[in-house]
Each structure stands twice: as C-alpha cells, then as structure tokens.
Curated annotation (Swiss-Prot):
Family as reported in the entry's similarity comment: Belongs to the NAT8 family.
Entry annotated with the keyword Cytoplasm: no
Annotated PROSITE patterns: GNAT
Matches recorded under CDD domains: NAT_SF
Membrane topology: Single-pass type II membrane protein
Gene3D superfamilies membership: 3.40.630.30
Protein name in UniProt: N-acetyltransferase 8B
Species per Swiss-Prot/TrEMBL record: Rattus norvegicus
Function: Endoplasmic reticulum (ER)-membrane-bound lysine N-acetyltransferase catalyzing the N6-acetylation of lysine residues in the lumen of the ER in various proteins, including PROM1 and BACE1, using acetyl-CoA as acetyl donor. Thereby, may regulate apoptosis through the acetylation and the regulation of the expression of PROM1. Acetylates and stabilizes BACE1 immature protein, leading to increased steady-state levels in neurons. By acting on BACE1 expression, may regulate amyloid beta-peptide formation. N(6)-lysine acetylation in ER maintains protein homeostasis and regulates reticulophagy.
Domain of life from the UniProt record: Eukaryota
Molecular function as annotated in GO: L-lysine N-acetyltransferase activity, acting on acetyl phosphate as donor; N-acetyltransferase activity
Keywords from the UniProt entry: Acetylation, Acyltransferase, Endoplasmic reticulum, Membrane, Signal-anchor, Transferase, Transmembrane, Transmembrane helix
C-alpha cells in the first residue's frame, strides 16, 4: 500500500487541489446521465416524443433518430449541475483557499500527499448561524484522486477534520453531499455521522433527480 501523510494546505498546492477537486466532481457526470435516463419522466419524454413522431410522420426510423439526437442534450443536462458546482466553488471559497480557510483559527484546509503529490483534499469552515447553543464546523470538498482510493485516505481526512473540531471546541461537524455520491454517504455513516435531512439545492439538481443529503456528527461531550 502506498504511504501518504496529511498536512495543512500551502499555496503551492493550489493547482493540484483544483485538479483533484474538479475531477472528483465531474467523474459523477456519467452516473448522473444513467440516473437521468432511468427517471420515469425521462422515459415518458422519450416515449412521448417517439410516439408523437410516429403518429405525425408514420416513420419509426425518424423516431429512433430523434431519440439519438436527444441523448446528447440529456448528457449536457446531466453534466451542468456538476460543472456549475465546480465553477461556483472556484469563484468563491476556492478562489483563494488561504484567505477562505486559513485566515482564522476556527477553520482549516488539509491535503493528503503521496510521493510529494496531492492526492486528497478537505476543508472546514465554521457555520455562520448554527442552532442556539451549538458551535458547528462544516466540512467541505472531501476528494481523493481515483488512483489513490481504497487506502483509507478519505477516512483519514475526515478524522483530521473531526479532531480539529474537537480541539477547537466545536459541538458538531456538519456537511452536505449528494445522493449520487453513494461511497461518500456510506463513509460518513460508517464514521458516525447521522442524516438530518435532504433537499434539492436548485432547479437544475431537481431536473436530474439528485438530492443533497445533510449529515451531522455530534461529539459525545456536546
């Protein structure tokens, strides 16, 4: 097994961090496309368009050709939520990681390195308006490069955030992830996180039928 270590982010890591984060998000486009194709409303759309064309033109061939033309549009639709998410992050908190995550003692950003290469990332920021009596830290951007999965890196990064939160006196660590990221949800639940809710963050996510799951880890002493 390849060795790795976790350390605090440095500005020299930026390009590698963006690469790991972007690839980690966009790798869900194919599975989102398959998920979208199997949604009842998508199947009804494809069937409805096909039948309408057959009734109007009398040609099944035209109907089949039309479906093949619709598939690229559905692929585009499946990719838009992920691309928009990446773009939003790169223009907000990840535009300047040092400023966003390392300018305050209550936040942090870490990378996992293997052979002097960044292979994993995770960040954490305090929740601005936590529930009364709670001090919450939100976990962001957990990602591990595809070549280095199955080595416990993601779990180690989450543990780094949990230990940081405990040391800083937080009562909870919260996060959001999508229902499409099954491996991530399984990881969090296995580490003691609890589901607290789910929702569609935008109309685009609703169109592709993917919800965001909200999870919470409360420290026993809290």
């Amino acid at each position: 097994m390849v060795s790795y270590h976790i350390c605090e982010y440095q500005d020299s890591d930026y390009k590698s961090v963006v690469d790991v984060f972007t690839k980690g998000a966009e790798e869900y486009i194919p599975s989102t496309f398959r998920h979208l194709l199997l949604l009842p409303r998508t199947l009804l759309l494809l069937l409805g368009v096909s039948l309408a064309l057959v009734l109007v033109s009398g040609s099944w061939l035209l109907a089949v050709v039309c479906i093949f033309f619709l598939l690229p549009f559905l692929w585009f639709l499946a990719g838009q939520p992920w691309k928009n998410y990446v773009s939003k992050c790169l223009h907000t908190d990840m535009a300047d990681i040092t400023k966003s995550y390392l300018s305050d003692r209550g936040s942090g950003f870490w990378v996992a390195e293997s052979g002097e290469q960044v292979v994993g990332t995770v960040g954490a920021l305090p929740v601005k308006e936590p529930p009364s009596g709670r001090k919450q830290l939100q976990l962001f951007h957990l990602a591990v490069s595809s070549q280095h999965r199955g080595q416990g890196i993601a779990k180690a990064l989450v543990r780094t955030v949990l230990q940081f939160a405990r040391d800083q006196g937080y009562t909870d660590v919260v996060l959001e992830t999508s229902t499409m990221q099954i491996g991530a949800v399984t990881l969090y639940l296995g580490m003691g996180f609890q589901k607290t809710g789910q929702y569609f963050p935008s109309m685009l996510w609703r169109l592709v039928g993917i919800r965001f799951v909200q999870l919470n880890y409360s420290f026993p002493s809290a």
